[in-house]
């Protein structure tokens, strides 16, 4: 049986919010079967819980934010991407502010935290969502789609007219597995352009961003001294974001995601369209040991080896 997983131990971290620039305390805790990923604002009295659910997305302005009334938790996508990558089904995410800390701008620090906490198999089958019929959403020339597929595949194309971003590094595809995620996707950092800095400042955005936690480009080149972690790091980060956004379905996907210039808003629109068309998907479990699992999850302790 492919089982649900939670954390073995409680683990804590501290970081800075991408948009707020505030210091944030983060605590990841185990949760019972069928809990899902629940975000808990511990700085409020009483505390407020917000489930990691596509229907709870309230804002997608340069990050995905979950909302309940006027309470929100923003920039959830990198942590959710790590949860999806390692196959964590159930966890409580306690946070001391309205934003998950940015860490180094990738999902890698969250992968390390989850690996350090350890994963524990639970006595219940893991539920997947299998795409049965194609679903597509468009916005101008942008699109995002889900199609039936035997595993979980992601294909993404960006379109930046920039000297440092060649045509050959604007598209990528991955067949998802824990190993692929950790080695090929998790280290890709968020990025921004100097020309957008004024807009960010005027709108109180990206106050926590710097070259320690983001790729920064001027009109000609990458400004970070160490350069890029992958030649196509920008499009890989878009895949990382998409994995996190898609995990707001509450379950791992069996299907193929394709996107052109998509972002958090279009990803969420895609999930809502899928959920609305109930004939386009189904829940599946793998209880028979003889069944081949469509997605390969590796015990996190051995992933980095």
From Swiss-Prot:
Pathway: Glycolipid biosynthesis; lipid IV(A) biosynthesis; lipid IV(A) from (3R)-3-hydroxytetradecanoyl-[acyl-carrier-protein] and UDP-N-acetyl-alpha-D-glucosamine: step 2/6. Catalyzes the hydrolysis of UDP-3-O-myristoyl-N-acetylglucosamine to form UDP-3-O-myristoylglucosamine and acetate, the committed step in lipid A biosynthesis. It is an enzyme of class 3 (hydrolase). Belongs to the LpxC family. Its EC number is 3.5.1.108. Its cofactor is Zn(2+). It catalyses: a UDP-3-O-[(3R)-3-hydroxyacyl]-N-acetyl-alpha-D-glucosamine + H2O = a UDP-3-O-[(3R)-3-hydroxyacyl]-alpha-D-glucosamine + acetate. GO terms for biological process: lipid A biosynthetic process. The gene is lpxC. Keywords: Hydrolase, Lipid A biosynthesis, Lipid biosynthesis, Lipid metabolism, Metal-binding, Zinc. This is UDP-3-O-acyl-N-acetylglucosamine deacetylase. Signal peptide: none annotated. It comes from the Bacteria. The active site is at 264 (proton donor). The keyword Lipid metabolism applies. One of its GO terms (cellular component) is membrane. Zn(2+) binds at residues 78, 237, 241. PANTHER family: UDP-3-O-ACYL-N-ACETYLGLUCOSAMINE DEACETYLASE 1, MITOCHONDRIAL-RELATED. The keyword Zinc-finger does not apply. GO terms for molecular function: metal ion binding; UDP-3-O-acyl-N-acetylglucosamine deacetylase activity.
């Amino acid at each position: 049986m492919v089982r649900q997983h939670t954390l073995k131990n409680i683990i804590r971290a501290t970081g800075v919010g991408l948009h707020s620039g505030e210091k944030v305390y983060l605590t990841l805790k185990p949760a019972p079967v069928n809990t899902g990923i629940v975000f808990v604002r511990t700085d409020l009295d009483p505390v407020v819980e917000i489930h990691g659910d596509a229907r709870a997305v309230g804002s997608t302005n340069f990050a995905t934010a979950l909302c309940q009334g006027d309470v929100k938790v923003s920039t959830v996508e990198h942590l959710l991407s790590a949860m999806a990558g390692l196959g964590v089904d159930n966890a409580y995410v306690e946070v001391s502010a309205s934003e998950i800390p940015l860490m180094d701008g990738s999902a890698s620090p969250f992968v390390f935290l989850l690996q350090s906490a350890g994963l524990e198999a639970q006595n219940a089958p893991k539920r997947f969502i299998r795409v049965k019929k194609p679903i597509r959403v468009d916005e101008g020339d942008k699109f995002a789609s889900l199609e039936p597929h035997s595993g979980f595949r992601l294909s993404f194309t960006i379109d930046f007219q920039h000297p440092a971003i060649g045509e050959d590094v604007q598209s990528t595809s991955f067949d998802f597995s824990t190993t692929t995620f950790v080695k090929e996707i998790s280290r890709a950092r968020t990025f921004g352009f100097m020309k957008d800095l004024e807009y960010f400042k005027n709108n109180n955005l990206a106050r926590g961003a710097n070259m320690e936690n983001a790729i920064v480009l001027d009109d000609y080149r990458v400004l970070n001294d160490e350069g890029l972690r992958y030649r196509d790091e920008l499009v890989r980060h878009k895949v990382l974001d998409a994995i996190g956004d898609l995990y707001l379905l509450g379950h791992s996907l069996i299907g193929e995601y394709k996107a052109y210039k998509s972002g958090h808003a279009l990803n969420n629109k895609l999930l809502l369209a899928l959920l609305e068309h109930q004939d386009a998907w189904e829940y599946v479990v793998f209880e028979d040991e003889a069944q081949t699992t469509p997605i390969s999850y590796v015990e996190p302790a051995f992933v980095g080896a």
